[in-house]
Amino acid sequence: LGIFKYLPFVVGMVPFLPEAWVTAAKGIPLPIGISFYTFTQIAFLVDAARGEVRETHPVHYGLFVTYFPHLIAGPVLHHKEMMPQFARPETYRPHWENLAAGSAIFVIGLLKKVIVADNMAPYATPVFQLAASGGDVSSAQAWVGALAYTFQLYFDFSAYSDMAVGLSRMFGVRLPLNFDSPYKAVNIIDFWRRWHMTLSRFLRDYLYIALGGNRHGKLRRYLNLFITMLLGGLWHGANFTYIIWGAWHGMWLAIERALGLDTNPQRFNPVKWAFTFLLVVVGWVIFRAENLHVAGRMYGAMFSFGDWQLSELNSAQLTGLQVATLVVAYLSLAFFGLRDFYRNAKPAPQATPLQVNNDG
């Protein structure tokens, strides 16, 4: 994984290497699904070293590693869920119930992809292309592009996961669900309980806990959360944009843990939902941007008001100390203000308990 996915990224940052080396590294083809089957094998090897692996039949292991439906976009498979299914004889017997259920799930995923995701792309792609080309992006265009990509990504990603689950079910093999209506989340902790759930599980079990989890004090716990999400961002792609996206989510996970937010909210709160959705949308912008420059142009357009723009800070001639003071003041207000905000915000009177479902 390091050679195929990250070597070009690392080589590109070394200024003294010959251009031929850089070109050769960037020309290495990336095998389909390498990120997913690498994670499945890491989990198997770690658990084997811990003595937690019960199923070791080479044929079942081979099926587990090479099982193809999930390789494009997940879910991330775990041997404890998959290998026992390959060991059961009934898995290989055709069942019309599995074929019917699998076909229905597959069609739902296909419709999400073709009808929703693909129709969001024309509203998102041109805006990011305009920002990349150096064109003027208005605030309205930037927000439309950011929101369109937010829905495009979810419906595209969850569609592929649904199709993988459905196709696998046709074969009589059950894959874990990967999404649970993530845009219903009322905080970032809740979001990561709903978004790419199998990846969240892997990062928790094989990275966060390995770093120490919450066993060494609060500060270490927050640092472990941040590092876990930082590396989780890097897993998505070899680009600084993914790293910063991971850092963005890691920062908010740490802040929310420090604020003591409800990790399993049972009631829907529209104010908390709106704030969480805003954080998610802001994060998706840098996730989608080709580079930091494009992300900066998008953010500059999104957070411009009338004739005033973020770029006008350049003409304010602020000193480094003044900028640092503003940053510290903002973070202080954000930390202490958000703590009171979350503690005092009341659910809407008509709100009903949030129903956890599998509607994707």
Residues covered by each model-derived region:
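Membrane-embedded transmembrane alpha-helical bundles that form the catalytic cores
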Residues: 1-329, 333, 337-360
